[in-house]
């Protein structure tokens, strides 16, 4: 025989039901599980040993065509698919995007500056770093982004229309922020 529910407890499907006793969050013996730090691709460790000026503690924007340069230099020691995966992780990292957003020149394998970052690539990096930081910040970082877009526009040497055409994207909030920066 099934025993009836005790009168002091509410059924589980009742949205107003609360468990008796302290909540899990209030229990002092409960600890949040720690997530291990994200591991980077093992090949990035080797690239940091081979090219510390590019992949070490301080990241620098990579020149266009660096994949081909790395394959030419180390094709016998690394698999093409591994290099693609490692560079994809590297160039999408917040640290790398911050280096691009800083306005540094692109660098070759010798660590020498070889070309400027294109204005639209700099703008993309600024916006992506902003989005990632804004997601973690309680304060509005849009004014800081607007100032950085103003500086990037001035450094580009382009006219307002040319710059706006290059950097216009699908996000209307970012487009409005960019327009405000160009009018300042």
Residue map of PLM features:
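Intrinsically disordered, low-complexity RNA-associated tracts
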Residues: 10-11, 15-31
């Amino acid at each position: 025989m099934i025993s009836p529910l005790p009168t002091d407890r509410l059924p589980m499907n009742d949205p107003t039901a609360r468990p008796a006793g302290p909540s899990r969050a209030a229990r002092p013996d409960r600890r949040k599980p720690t997530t291990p730090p994200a591991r980077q691709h093992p090949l990035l460790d080797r690239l940091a040993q081979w090219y510390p000026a590019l992949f070490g503690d301080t990241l620098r924007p990579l020149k266009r065509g660096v994949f081909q340069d790395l394959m030419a230099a180390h094709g016998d020691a690394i698999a093409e698919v591994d290099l693609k995966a490692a560079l994809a992780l590297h160039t999408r990292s917040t640290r790398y995007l911050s280096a691009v957003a800083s306005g540094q020149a692109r660098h070759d394998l010798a660590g020498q500056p070889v070309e400027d970052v294109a204005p639209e690539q700099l703008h993309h990096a600024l916006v992506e770093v902003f989005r990632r930081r804004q997601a973690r910040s309680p304060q509005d970082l849009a004014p800081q982004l607007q100032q950085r877009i103003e500086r990037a526009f001035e450094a580009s040497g382009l006219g307002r229309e040319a710059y706006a055409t290059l950097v216009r994207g699908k996000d209307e909030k970012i487009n409005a922020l960019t327009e405000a920066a160009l009018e300042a």
